Design a protein with these regions (language model features):
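Bilobed periplasmic-binding protein-like "clamshell/Venus-flytrap" ligand-binding domains
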Residues: 8-9, 50-60
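Hinge/lid segment of periplasmic solute-binding proteins
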Residues: 1-17, 42, 100
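Beta->alpha turn/N-cap motifs
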Residues: 144-149, 167
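Short helix-initiation/N-cap motifs at beta->coil->alpha
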Residues: 36-42, 120-135
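Alpha-to-beta junction loops
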Residues: 51-55, 135-144, 160
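Extracytoplasmic/periplasmic substrate-recognition and gating elements
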Residues: 29, 114, 154-167
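Glycine-centered hinge/linker elements that transmit conformational signals in sensory
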Residues: 45, 87-121
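Short, solvent-exposed loop/beta-turn-alpha elements that line the ligand-binding surface or hinge
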Residues: 1, 76-103, 154-157
């Protein structure tokens, strides 16, 4: 605060959130580029599964972030906020019965039916997914933030080559 009612700030802890992946496991499954769309993520997960590799894991603390992130691809970030708060978005209410909301949910159900999620994803308590599945190379993708490398450093396989993507 500089005395003229102007508040100044310095970014303290910038971070990103998305998909960390194991480059070695992607190469083993024949994936040559990182996914940039849901369809490409679907195709990559199919290749991983076919290669006997668990495609995706997460922890309880971050799984809902993945859902919100994906839902925003259908209704926008402001639409997700409106859905959660009950506010209007673009002059209309957004409900759980909205066709786009249903489509996002169905795409998650499709991934589950295809076996793309770790069998432990629903019960992983932070930091199990990142430290017991992703870091040692037992799952190819983990949904997490930029704090992951530091948090998982004691569990990381010696040959882990990190990568990061969003779609």
């Amino acid at each position: 605060h500089d005395g003229d009612d102007t508040l100044h700030s310095i970014p303290y802890q910038p971070s990103i959130f998305g998909f960390f992946y194991n480059k070695t496991l992607f190469a083993k499954a024949g994936i040559e580029s990182t996914p940039t769309t849901w369809a490409e993520l679907d195709a990559a997960c199919a290749k991983l599964k076919d290669a006997g590799i668990t495609p995706i894991t997460a922890d309880d603390a971050y799984l809902t972030s993945f859902i919100g992130y994906h839902l925003a691809r259908y209704i926008g970030q402001d639409g997700v906020k409106a859905l959660v708060t009950g506010e209007e978005y673009n002059g209309e209410s957004v409900t759980w019965d909205d066709e786009k909301v249903k489509a996002a949910a169905e795409s998650f159900a499709d991934f589950a039916k295809k076996g793309y999620f770790s069998k432990n994803i629903a019960t992983n308590k932070y930091p199990a997914g990142q430290n017991q599945e992703f870091a040692p190379g037992n799952a190819a993708i983990v949904i997490c933030g930029s704090w992951l490398p530091n948090e998982a450093k004691d569990s990381v396989a010696d040959d882990l080559e990190w990568g990061y993507f969003n779609y």
